[in-house]
């Protein structure tokens, strides 16, 4: 477990307009909480997810009503759509025909080989990948009988069995997940899977819990896996508004420097030295930069002891003291501003920095 693994050679798999695996950045996914047959509600939720930074969205497809709604949903959203299928191969066929960008199935639980073959052939014809979703809580009986309880080896064995079914049908556009609610089990399963095959891995800690506890549990588990160099796409699973899943996922990726299009906030812990309303200012700035797709660090520091030094580590920042603040940019003081306009002035500088980034990006792209 202590050997660091880098997965640059992971097989690239196309999901809509995104490439999962290869040398591409990790993508963030979520799943809707609406009834999929309610097109209006589902599309509205997906639009909120898109705005929050979701890059791929999955919807449940438990019946024909849901399957029949997929085409209408697909036409009204702007990110790849994944259909989650269990047991009924006909729903997978309907989803593929509706134009989804990926299906999530376990080939071993949709029936006879001829049914699997129909799904695979349909997916091949439309270049639609398949995600094999192994879950510690629903492993096959024979695997539980073999190992006695859910184990990492059992999860990888299950994944390999499903992979073989697809490979035997000459299908290789495969993504694999090995989810568990036990953090240590998930870490071990993903570690072993990364050594067993080179298909892209979809990361997740399943049934992680509520917004607060589940967010921490997911961050701990996903962070440990990411620190091994493992993972190509991820979902934070919370018993909460799915938009909250995106917020946690973005922060996890930013913490590891794995997101090139997200701003990061640095703010100091509160203490008796603070002489400005740091908590209010930090929260407002965090909300402001949440949708800024620029890899900048923004610092909000509350005193003159550590503030100036820590602010210099950021691209832009402010260090407050005695009801006023020093604005820093790339380690240099820009100006001193009173607390009453501190946030507005910082926002202006953030906007200027973001605009400069986009101009440079356009200039670089024009030279290629």
Swiss-Prot record:
One of the Pfam families matching this protein, by short name: GcpE
CC cofactor: [4Fe-4S] cluster
Binding site for [4Fe-4S] cluster: 268, 271, 303, 310
GO biological process, one term: isopentenyl diphosphate biosynthetic process, methylerythritol 4-phosphate pathway
This enzyme's EC code(s): 1.17.7.3
Cofactor, how bound (note): Binds 1 [4Fe-4S] cluster.
Record keywords, A-Z: 4Fe-4S, Iron, Iron-sulfur, Isoprene biosynthesis, Metal-binding, Oxidoreductase
Catalytic reaction(s) noted: (2E)-4-hydroxy-3-methylbut-2-enyl diphosphate + oxidized [flavodoxin] + H2O + 2 H(+) = 2-C-methyl-D-erythritol 2,4-cyclic diphosphate + reduced [flavodoxin]
Annotated metabolic or biological route of this protein: Isoprenoid biosynthesis; isopentenyl diphosphate biosynthesis via DXP pathway; isopentenyl diphosphate from 1-deoxy-D-xylulose 5-phosphate: step 5/6
Listed GO MF terms: 4 iron, 4 sulfur cluster binding; 4-hydroxy-3-methylbut-2-en-1-yl diphosphate synthase activity (ferredoxin); 4-hydroxy-3-methylbut-2-enyl-diphosphate synthase activity (flavodoxin); iron ion binding
Task performed by this protein: Converts 2C-methyl-D-erythritol 2,4-cyclodiphosphate (ME-2,4cPP) into 1-hydroxy-2-methyl-2-(E)-butenyl 4-diphosphate.
Family note: Belongs to the IspG family.
Name the record gives this protein: 4-hydroxy-3-methylbut-2-en-1-yl diphosphate synthase (flavodoxin)
């Amino acid at each position: 477990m202590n050997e660091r693994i880098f997965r640059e050679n992971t097989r690239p798999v196309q999901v809509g307009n995104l490439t999962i695996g290869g040398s591409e950045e990790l993508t963030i996914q979520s799943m809707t909480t609406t009834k999929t047959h309610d097109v209006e509600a589902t599309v509205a939720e997906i639009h909120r997810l898109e705005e929050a930074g979701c890059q791929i969205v999955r919807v449940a497809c438990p019946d024909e009503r849901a399957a029949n709604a997929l085409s209408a949903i697909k036409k009204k959203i702007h990110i790849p759509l994944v259909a989650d299928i269990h047991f009924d191969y006909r729903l997978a066929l309907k989803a593929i025909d509706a134009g989804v960008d990926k299906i999530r199935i376990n080939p071993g639980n949709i029936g006879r080989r001829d049914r699997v073959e129909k799904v695979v052939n349909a997916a091949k014809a439309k270049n639609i990948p398949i995600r094999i979703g192994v879950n510690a809580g629903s492993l096959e009986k024979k695997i539980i009988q073999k190992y006695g309880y859910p184990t990492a080896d059992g999860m990888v064995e299950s994944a390999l069995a499903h992979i073989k079914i697809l490979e035997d049908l000459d299908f290789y556009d495969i993504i694999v997940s090995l989810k568990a609610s036990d953090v240590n089990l998930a870490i071990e399963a993903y570690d072993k899977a990364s050594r067993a095959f080179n298909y892209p891995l979809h990361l997740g800690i399943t049934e992680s819990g509520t917004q607060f506890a589940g967010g921490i549990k997911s961050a701990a588990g996903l962070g440990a896996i990411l620190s091994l160099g493992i993972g190509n796409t991820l979902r934070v699973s919370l018993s909460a508004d799915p938009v909250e899943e995106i917020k946690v996922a973005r922060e996890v990726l930013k913490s590891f420097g794995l997101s090139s299009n997200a701003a990061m906030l640095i703010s100091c812990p509160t203490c008796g030295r603070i002489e400005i309303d740091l908590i209010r200012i930090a929260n407002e700035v965090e909300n402001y930069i949440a949708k800024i797709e620029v890899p900048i660090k923004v610092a909000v520091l509350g005193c003159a002891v550590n503030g100036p030094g820590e602010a210099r580590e950021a691209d832009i920042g402010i260090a407050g003291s005695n009801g006023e603040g020093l604005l820093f940019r790339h380690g240099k003081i820009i100006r001193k501003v009173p607390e009453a306009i501190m946030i507005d002035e910082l926002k202006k500088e953030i906007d200027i920095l973001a605009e400069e980034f986009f101009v440079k990006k356009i200039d670089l792209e024009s030279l290629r």
